[in-house]
A protein has these predicted regions:
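Beta-strand-rich interaction surfaces with strong enrichment in secreted/lumenal proteins
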Residues: 5, 47, 89-91
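Short aromatic-glycine motifs in intrinsically disordered, low-complexity regions
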Residues: 1-11, 72-76
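Conserved positions in beta-strands of structured domains
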Residues: 18-21, 90, 102-106
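Hydrophobic beta-strand-centered segment that forms part of the acyl-chain substrate-binding groove
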Residues: 63-102, 126, 133-134
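HotDog/MaoC-like acyl-thioester-processing domains
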Residues: 25-29, 93-97, 104-144
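Catalytic strand-loop segment that frames the active site of acyl-thioester-processing enzymes
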Residues: 12-51
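Compact, glycine-rich, soluble single-domain proteins
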Residues: 42-69, 81-82
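Hydrophobic core residues within well-ordered beta-strands of beta-rich domains
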Residues: 14-16, 99, 113
Length: 144
């Protein structure tokens, strides 16, 4: 696990980001490689497995957390949680798939951080929207 991923509070089996392509204080590009043997696929759906949208949303939130962790202004921030998600799913994701996760900071206030997010598979958008994270120990100045 890379040091940026280790800054996330998540661990297996609920850590979905397995690669950080690039990250800075405002943007993270990450990836989640779904091989097809993951336990959750056994029931979603037998004979035609699909990656659950709620897990894609969580993976996008983890990518946003990577961007927060890459910001030196939030070096002491510890963990966080997804407090709001407005994500639209454009097409289903069947394994095997490399889900590219993009999160771009749009601003924040106090502990709240707002991100535009997008997930792609083979260049096609599979999910997009906005999420808000609450980061413990974060003291975002008002940004709009």
């Amino acid at each position: 696990m890379g040091s940026r991923i280790e800054r996330l509070p998540h661990r297996a089996p609920f850590l979905f980001v397995d690669e950080v392509v690039s990250a800075d204080a405002s943007v993270a590009h990450c990836a989640w490689n779904v091989g097809g043997r993951e336990e959750f696929l056994k029931g979603h759906f037998p004979g035609r497995p699909l990656v659950p949208g709620v897990l894609i949303t969580e993976a996008l939130a983890q990518a946003a957390g990577i961007a927060v962790a890459a910001d030196p202004a939030h070096a002491n921030a510890a963990g966080g949680m997804l407090v709001h998600a407005d994500v639209r799913f454009r097409r289903p994701v069947a394994p095997p798939a490399r889900i590219e996760l993009h999160a771009s900071a749009e601003g924040g206030l106090g502990a709240l951080h707002r991100f535009a997010v997008e997930a792609r598979v083979d260049g096609a958008v599979v999910a997009e929207g906005r999420i808000v994270l609450a980061i413990q120990g974060s003291d975002n100045a008002a940004q709009e």
